[in-house]
Curated annotation (Swiss-Prot):
Residues 147-385 form the Ras-GAP domain. The gene is Gapvd1. This is GTPase-activating protein and VPS9 domain-containing protein 1. Acts both as a GTPase-activating protein (GAP) and a guanine nucleotide exchange factor (GEF), and participates in various processes such as endocytosis, insulin receptor internalization or LC2A4/GLUT4 trafficking. Acts as a GEF for the Ras-related protein RAB31 by exchanging bound GDP for free GTP, leading to regulate LC2A4/GLUT4 trafficking. In the absence of insulin, it maintains RAB31 in an active state and promotes a futile cycle between LC2A4/GLUT4 storage vesicles and early endosomes, retaining LC2A4/GLUT4 inside the cells. Present in adipocytes and fibroblasts (at protein level). Ubiquitously expressed. Keywords: Endocytosis, Endosome, GTPase activation, Guanine-nucleotide releasing factor, Membrane, Phosphoprotein. The modification Phosphothreonine is found at T390, T458, T470, T762. Residues 447-475, 574-608, 738-821, 846-867, 888-1022, 1039-1072 are annotated as: Disordered. It comes from Mus musculus. Residues 778-789, 888-902, 952-973, 995-1006, 1061-1071 have a biased composition (Basic and acidic residues). The lineage of its organism: Eukaryota, Metazoa, Chordata, Craniata, Vertebrata. The modification Phosphoserine is found at residues 227, 466, 566, 569, 742, 746, 757, 766, 876, 902-903, 908, 914, 964, 1017, 1044, 1076, 1083.
Length: 1458
């Protein structure tokens, strides 16, 4: 190995620390930004959809809503407030949230309820349909919501259209549930907008350019469009042959124009079939497949219905009203253009139906001019999609991992929805879905919640807004939660629910407040906030697991996806909220972070997920029952549990909060165990504690994570038996219950891990594992995660707990008392099957409880020798003392080594609860090796404690010695009293552990195994022991190991034995390096047991890493190499290079008066001085190796940052789209209101047109137009419709009025001299046409610089100017010219990046573009703008207008003959 340079190492470590710190800060900022953007997105989307629904009401102008009411409603919508649901609904928010969540996940029930409501003629069915789309499915922003809605549509086809006598008529009427929902969906679907824009923009603009005549093909209607005078002028004398001939000629001409137009539309339809939305195609193919099976329907009829759906309901509305869909934004559509668009839409539908039904005989002639299969071919492509059962999902989901956590719904909508469901239930129209609806409604409160002032809710933003009393809701208020792919599927599904529902329907006139109701999510993990340990252990479990399949997505694949969008911004909030929540868990941040992240760390997670799914449906209702029980007494409300639902707060001293079982149904536990056993059978071996040599992780985290989740929801809250009840039977049953429910099995580790974080704030109340797994723990989970990651390196192995000793002992008593469930529990015993390397001594009698449990057998060989050292059998094989001794000798490890090994493993395997005064202390690093904490099944007594954790460490010794006395006195109390006392925190663990270790050495000596296993002690009666077992079982549940800690200890203790020879061959030890200043233990704990080399080595390595990563290179000594290389092997430790280095650092700290750094460095130097040179070199080599192995953590941070940046960018793009939709809807709303205003002033407008015709001077015409526009603006200001309009809406309205008025007088204003102007334009047009044949980009008359010729002929600029005829107002025409000029400048800048194009470069290109585009009526355009807009030109507009007129004049002078 290359000799290490301490200075280089320190340099690298400092770089690493700075980089990790800055990355974490950036990731935290990104998490906050993503949440802000997501919140804004959902609020904006909610308002935008309500505006769209309001617009539809205005267009229909139904009796229920006058234009004035619609305008008022639009104003109110803009001011919508979002209010947390609990403020309005109180504790009932939970029930409503669950109702909405379960309803949302049942598309079939929604569809059957809507159909039943229609059959019952419920008047609010339509508003409920709006609520389903906008609130329940959140406008389908999230892909999962879209998938659910597609399934609702599929069921509607089955229940509504398939059952109808005349489904086609039902569909065409457009009032059935399917039609309304399809319209809402297709209007909001972004891919549908893309398809419509790509297909229709060009042909519609072309139609607007040529909108001079109505393309009427019916001769009778054509004649009616002209006054008698015009008829005579155009066609001659009425009734004559010449008249009929002229009319027919005009009809033929119109037909030819129409055919050309329609062919253009069809061509674009075919060209853009590739971007037809997959989800719409899926609906059409589902309709075709479902209805084709109906006997009474012909295939042609079914095809006709698909055609209606595609054309009548999707494409043709966009053809007729393109501005409503954003296809055309600034070009006004006048009456002539609208008529022509309707003609196109009608022809498209007729062509699609060719061959399937008899058309109108009069249209057959015109249809004969088309290719018969032109539209049918397009339909075949769409209908021909394979009708797969599951809705299509996008292959690239940029929001993967994001999920919705709330529903936006107004109070009135919520009540309407609930009442609708109740009326459907009572209407007896439901068939097989009746039971499901009954179950849903059963959990809803009977009384209507009182309505408070604010009704809205905010989905994501509320972490900051929610009061501290509602921690859980804060979490749920976040609309976006993360789904980690490595977590269980149930978690994913839960999270997804919440985000999307963010909208409310418009059934009430003033829904200015929207409730944000939480759907109740499970635990979530914030991207980038995993600690170093967790990431490295995931890496380790993925890379080296032999027995279990590796999930590539865990870490190697895409941790950025695994943990990418767990955007629970409550982490920030949780920090302030934590202490008030659970006073005992100051550093619960660390624990929760670790436990959450480790849920998915293990490789066999998928199997665990299957087990979870098996149980999910059976346990789903248990939580509901609990809610009902608590609700009866208003307990949730009184205890402040409305949101947090932390059951531990409500438990009385005699309550049992066991998971799953109660005294009254003792068999449930065993049944549940058998189910778990069956579901997880194949996981048992995978989750064994394998030896390091085999590359396996100590514990399989995933197997456990699944069960914990299922058990979490099933609580029993029965009162425990009192002391006076028959103790034997009751306690025996209770013990079985505890054993079965507190996470013994190989699949339950996660439960136990998670319990740590949800330890009740009352130290005396020990609660079984179920609490932790409830989703309400999340607030602290994330908060904990944040704090853990805020340390320098983020990683810590565990946090010491005041109860650690008791917890540790608890592991030994799990199966002590004989019980009928013992054999069944054997496979779930963490000692026998989980830590597969040691077979457990399982006595059949109650043994005396020794003061310290024995260590487990050696587990070192794998780490040191590379071979697996396994006991002969797994399971419940009982080892005699002799066998144990023989095994030890066979694997020849010194006794001390064996003990240190086993204790390290087990102690690290238990995750302690954090105590306020011992925040973030890496527990497994500080536990001495001999303090075995869980290797055997012997009974261990809980120590009662009388000192608080903040007491001096010296108290620990006296506590320990008082143990046996305390136990005796403890026995005289009722068992539940003992539970409180023994659960009280004691002296901090590291000291007590050392005391125990010294006693081990004194009392037990090398024959500890035989002493412990052979000597029964009469001190405890069987009954008292059972009671103690129960108590320790409770404690033990909290101490289960997290995979990361287990893996850690496995390597670390192997690394340094007395001679320091162990190879550093496993990345697991890396996690031990992840410490910050907070993690340093006091020197007291170091002095307590200096002879423990394994512990000291790890401790020194930790401290030295901290010293190195904060050192400054300026302070490096110069001659360290010669000093180090010249040292003989046994020189004094003061002289080695680490000490020299530290001395310089101490000097610098003294110079800077940095007291904290001085203390750290001095402590580090004191520890280093105890090692010889060789060990110091190994120390540096180990730190360097750890540094190299931390590369995956750096990669993890980078991927998380990239993932968050991608998500943020995508959310911003989604927000842009939503804002654009909202703008389009608002502008169209204004246009409709203007149309209504002008209709009321039609008489005035006609008078104005007549006056305008009489004028001849251009100035007079301009003045008259200006005066009339001002008159209309004044009328608008006084109109009741416009009373609530904003300034922006008034400006839009003025623009709309100007466009409408100029449209009416366009020909009079544009051609003041009529035929003279038209002929003049025609002459110039022909001249330019001749020029375009001979002029090229390098023509000598133009002199375009050669550098700009590469972009010729500038087609995008040509297409801009060609559309100038579509605009009718002088302002819009100038804007069109500006867009052309700016396009040319962009292209010129692109061609030559070194210089800015000037006028000499620009004008020749402008001339060339005008020649090639040859827009019609150039001279009249110049005259029109000069007359009506010249006085308004200024700034940039004026400059480009001047360039444009100069170019037109220059074109007139070019001679095409030269």
């Amino acid at each position: 190995m290359v000799k290490l340079d301490i200075h280089t190492l320190a340099h690298h470590l400092k770089q690493e620390r700075l980089y990790v710190s800055s990355e974490k800060q950036l990731i935290q900022r990104l998490n906050a930004d993503v949440l802000k953007t997501a919140e804004k997105l959902y609020r904006t989307a909610w308002i935008a959809k309500q505006q769209r629904i309001n617009l539809d009401r205005l267009i229909i102008t139904s009796a229920e809503a006058s234009p004035a009411e619609c305008c008022q409603h639009a104003k109110i919508l803009e001011d919508t407030q979002f209010v947390d649901g609990y403020k309005q609904l109180g504790f009932q928010e939970t029930a409503y949230g669950e109702f909405l969540s379960r309803l949302r996940e049942n598309p079939r029930l929604i569809a059957s309820s809507l159909v039943a409501g229609e059959k019952l003629n419920q008047e609010n069915t339509q508003s409920v349909i709006y609520t389903v789309f906008t609130s329940l499915y959140g406008n389908c922003i999230m892909q999962e919501d879209e998938s659910y809605l597609l399934q609702v549509l599929r069921y509607l086809i089955e229940f509504e259209l398939k059952e109808s006598d005349n489904p086609r008529r039902l569909l065409r009427r457009g009032t059935c549930a399917f039609s309304i929902l399809f319209k809402l969906f297709s209007e909001g679907l972004f891919s549908a907008k893309l398809f419509l824009t790509a297909t229709l923009h060009e042909p519609i603009m072309q139609l607007l350019v040529e909108d001079e005549d109505h393309l009427e093909t019916d001769p009778n209607k054509l004649i009616e469009r002209f006054s008698p005078a015009q008829q005579e002028k155009l066609f001659g004398e009425k009734g004559s042959d010449r008249f009929r001939q002229k009319v027919q000629e005009m009809v033929d001409s119109n037909e030819a124009k129409l055919v050309a137009l329609v062919n253009k539309f069809i061509g674009y339809l075919k060209q853009n079939t590739y971007c037809f939305p997959h989800s719409l195609r899926w609906i059409v193919s589902q309709m075709y497949k479902t209805l084709s099976c109906v006997d009474r329907l012909e295939v042609g009829e079914v095809r006709a219905m698909c055609t209606d759906l595609l054309l009548a309901c999707f494409i043709c509305p966009a053809v007729v009203n393109p501005e409503q869909y954003g296809i055309i934004s600034d070009a006004p559509i006048n009456e002539v253009a609208r008529f022509n668009l309707m003609q196109v839409g009608r022809l498209l539908q007729q062509l699609a139906m060719t061959g399937t039904e008899e058309g109108d005989p009069r249209t057959k002639n015109s249809l004969g001019k088309f290719d018969k299969g032109c539209v049918a071919a397009f339909l075949d492509v769409v209908i021909g999609g394979r009708a797969v059962e599951t809705p299509p999902m996008s292959s690239v989901n940029l929001l993967e991992g994001l999920s919705r956590t709330v529903v936006y719904i107004s109070y009135s909508q919520l009540i309407t929805l609930v009442n609708f469901m109740k009326s459907v239930m009572s209407g007896d129209q439901l068939k097989e879905d009746r039971m499901a609806l009954d179950n849903l409604l059963a959990n809803l409160p009977q009384a209507k919640p009182g309505k408070s002032s604010s009704l809205d809710m905010t989905p994501y933003s509320t972490p900051q807004m929610s009061p501290a009393t509602t921690p859980a809701n804060k979490k749920n208020r976040l609309p976006i939660a993360t789904r980690s792919r490595s977590r269980s599927n149930m978690l994913m599904d839960l999270h997804m629910d919440h985000e999307g529902s963010s909208q409310e329907t418009i059934q009430e006139v003033q829904p200015e407040e929207v409730l944000v109701i939480s759907l109740g999510t499970g635990p979530q993990l914030t991207p980038g906030m995993m600690s170093e340990n967790e990431v490295l252990n995931m890496q380790l479990s993925d890379g080296g697991q032999g027995d279990v399949p590796v999930d590539e997505n865990k870490l190697h694949g895409k941790p950025d996806k695994t943990l990418r969008f767990s955007l629970c911004s409550d982490n920030l909030e949780g920090i302030s909220e934590g202490p008030s929540n659970r006073s005992n868990s100051v550093s619960s941040l660390d624990l929760e972070g670790e436990s959450v992240s480790e849920l998915g760390a293990g490789p066999s997670g998928s199997n665990g997920v299957e087990a979870l799914q098996l149980l999910e449906h059976e346990q789903a209702t248990t939580q509901d029952n609990l809610d009902d029980k608590l609700r009866k007494f208003e307990i949730r409300d009184m205890m402040g549990l409305t949101d947090d639902r932390d059951i531990s707060e409500t438990v009385s001293e005699t309550w049992s909060t066991d998971v799953l079982g109660s005294d009254f149904d003792p068999n449930v536990d065993e049944d549940r165990l058998q189910e778990i056993a069956g579901a997880a059978a194949e996981n048992v071996l995978g989750s064994l504690l394998c030896l390091p040599g085999s590359g396996s992780v100590l514990l399989d985290p995933c197997t456990g994570s699944t069960i914990s989740e299922t058990t979490s929801e099933a609580w029993s809250v029965e009162v425990l038996p009192s002391d006076s009840e028959a103790p034997d039977l009751k306690q025996e049953e209770r013990l079985q219950e505890l054993e079965s429910c507190s996470g013994l099995g190989s699949t339950s580790d996660d439960t136990d891990v998670r319990e740590v974080s949800s330890r009740p704030s009352t130290p005396g109340l020990s609660v079984v594992s179920g609490i932790s797994a409830t989703s309400e723990d999340i607030p602290n989970k994330i908060e904990d995660l944040r704090s853990e990651c805020s340390s320098d390196f983020g990683g810590k192995d565990s946090v010491t707990s005041p109860d650690m000793d008791d917890i540790a002992h608890g592991a030994h008593q799990l199966t002590s008392p004989p019980s009928q469930s013992e054999s069944l529990l054997a496979m779930f015993d963490p000692l026998s099957s989980h830590e597969g390397a040691s077979a457990v001594v399982r006595p059949k009698v109650h043994y005396a409880r020794p003061s310290h449990p024995p260590p487990d057998p050696p587990i070192l060989e794998g780490a040191v020798g590379g071979n697996e050292a396994r006991l002969p059998n797994f399971g419940s094989h009982v080892l005699t003392a002799a066998e144990m001794e023989a095994f030890k000798q066979r694997h020849s490890y010194p006794e001390r080594l064996v003990r240190s090994r086993s204790s390290d493993i087990v102690s690290s395997v238990r995750r302690p609860m954090s105590d306020p005064s011992w925040n973030r202390r890496p527990g497994n690093e500080e536990l001495p090796p001999a303090a075995a904490t869980g290797a055997t099944s012997l009974v261990a007594a809980p120590h009662s404690s009388s000192s608080s954790p903040s007491k001096d460490s010296s108290r620990g010794e006296t506590e320990e010695r008082k143990d046996s006395d305390d136990e005796r006195s403890d026995r005289s109390r009722p068992w539940w009293r003992k539970r409180f006392v023994s659960a009280m925190p004691k002296a901090p663990i590291p000291f007590r552990k050392k005391e125990k270790q010294e006693k081990d050495k004194d009392d037990l000596g090398p024959d500890r195994f035989s002493t412990l296993t052979d000597e029964p002690s009469p001190r405890l009666s069987a009954q008292a022991q059972v009671a103690e077992d129960i108590l320790d079982k409770y404690r033990n549940a909290i101490k289960r190991t997290s995979p990361s800690e287990g893996a850690m200890a496995n390597d670390e203790s192997a690394e340094v034995m007395g001679d320091g020879e162990s190879a550093h061959d496993s990345p697991r030890e890396e996690a031990l390096q992840n410490i910050s200043a907070d993690d340093l233990p006091d020197s007291a704990s170091q002095a307590a047991h200096p002879q423990d080399s394994a512990f000291s080595y790890r401790d020194v390595k930790k401290k030295l890493r901290l010293a190195l990563c904060s050192a400054d290179s300026v302070a490096f000594p110069v001659l360290t190499h010669s000093t180090r290389n010249g040292l003989p092997d046994h020189t004094d430790p003061e002289d080695n290079e680490i000490v020299c280095f530290l001395k310089v650092q101490i000097a610098e700290a003294i110079n800077l008066q940095d007291k904290s750094l001085m203390a750290q460095l001095q402590e580090t130097m004191r520890c280093v001085c105890r090692f010889d040179n060789r060990t110091c070199r190994k120390l540096l080599a180990s730190i360097a190796e750890d540094y190299r192995k931390r590369a995956p953590y750096i990669a993890y941070l980078t991927r998380c940052r990239q993932g968050l940046q991608t998500t943020q960018a995508h959310l911003e793009r989604l927000l842009q789209r939503v804002l654009r939709d909202k703008e389009v809807a608002n502008r169209y709303f204004t246009t409709v209101c203007v149309r209504l205003l002008l209709e009321s002033k039609e008489k005035k407008i006609r008078e104005f047109i007549q006056d305008f015709q009489k004028l001849t001077a251009a100035d007079d015409k301009t003045a008259q137009v200006e005066d009339f526009l001002q008159f209309l603006y004044g009328v608008m200001a006084q109109d009741v419709i416009w009373q609530n309009a904003s300034e922006e809406q008034l400006q839009d309205a003025q623009l709309a009025i100007e466009r409408s008025v100029m449209n009416r007088i366009f020909k009079l204003a544009f051609y003041p001299n009529q035929d003279g102007d038209i002929l003049r334009d025609q002459v110039l047009h022909e001249h330019i046409q001749r020029l375009s044949k001979v002029v090229t980009a390098n023509h000598r008359a133009l002199q375009i610089p050669e550098v700009y010729l590469r972009e010729a002929p500038w087609p995008s600029a040509q297409s801009e100017i060609r559309t100038i005829s579509a605009y009718k107002t002088p302002r819009d025409k100038v804007q069109c010219i500006l867009r052309m000029c700016s396009t040319i400048m962009n292209l010129l800048s692109l061609a030559n990046e070194d210089s800015v194009p000037g006028a000499d470069d620009f004008v020749p290109v402008l001339v060339f573009v005008l020649i090639k585009a040859n827009p019609p009526c150039l001279l009249s355009t110049v005259q029109y703008i000069s007359s009506f807009y010249a006085s308004c030109l200024s700034g940039e507009e004026s400059y480009w207008w001047m360039q444009f007129t100069a170019a037109v004049e220059f074109i007139k002078t070019i001679d095409d003959r030269k």
